[in-house]
Amino acid sequence: MAAVSLSVSTVKPLGDRVFVKVSESEEKTAGGILLPDTAKEKPQVGEVVQVGPGKPNEDGSRQAPEVGIGDKVLYSKYAGTDIKLGSDEYVLLSEKDILAIVN
C-alpha cells in the first residue's frame, strides 16, 4: 500500500463538510498559571481552510455552503473528526455542526 502525503491543499471535503484549522488553545489561565496539555479545553473556534461543494438536494442541485474559506467559525465541542497535519490541528466538520461565524 502506498503512503499518502496529506496537506491542506490535498484535502477536499465532500458534500456539506468543512475543513477547519483549529485555533490555538490558551497556554495559561487569566491568573498566569501555565496549563499542562491534559488540562487544556478543546478549542471550539477555527478558520475555514477548505469547503465542500454543498449538500445535494433531491433534484440533484446543491445547496451552497453558508461559510467560505477564511471565515472564523465557532463549532460544537464534540463535533467532527480531529486531524493533525505537521504541527497544526484541524477538524473536519459537517456544516450543521458550525454554530456561528465569528467576526
Swiss-Prot record:
Family of the protein in this entry: Belongs to the GroES chaperonin family.
Q: How does it assemble?
A: Heptamer of 7 subunits arranged in a ring. Interacts with the chaperonin GroEL.
Record has Transcription regulation as a keyword: no
Cellular component, GO annotation: cytoplasm
NCBIfam families the record matches: PRK00364.1-6, PRK00364.2-2, PRK00364.2-4, PRK00364.2-5
Q: Which residues cross the membrane?
A: none
Which species is this record about? Synechococcus sp. (strain CC9902)
Keywords (A to Z) from UniProt: Chaperone, Cytoplasm
Q: What is its main location?
A: cytoplasm
So which domain of life are we looking at? Bacteria
Gene Ontology terms, MF aspect: ATP binding; metal ion binding; protein folding chaperone; protein-folding chaperone binding; unfolded protein binding
Tell me, which GO biological process terms does this entry list? chaperone cofactor-dependent protein refolding
Q: What is this protein called?
A: Co-chaperonin GroES
Gene this protein is translated from: groES
Q: What role does this protein play?
A: Together with the chaperonin GroEL, plays an essential role in assisting protein folding. The GroEL-GroES system forms a nano-cage that allows encapsulation of the non-native substrate proteins and provides a physical environment optimized to promote and accelerate protein folding. GroES binds to the apical surface of the GroEL ring, thereby capping the opening of the GroEL channel.
As given in the record, the signal peptide range reads none
Where does it live in the cell?
Answer: Cytoplasm
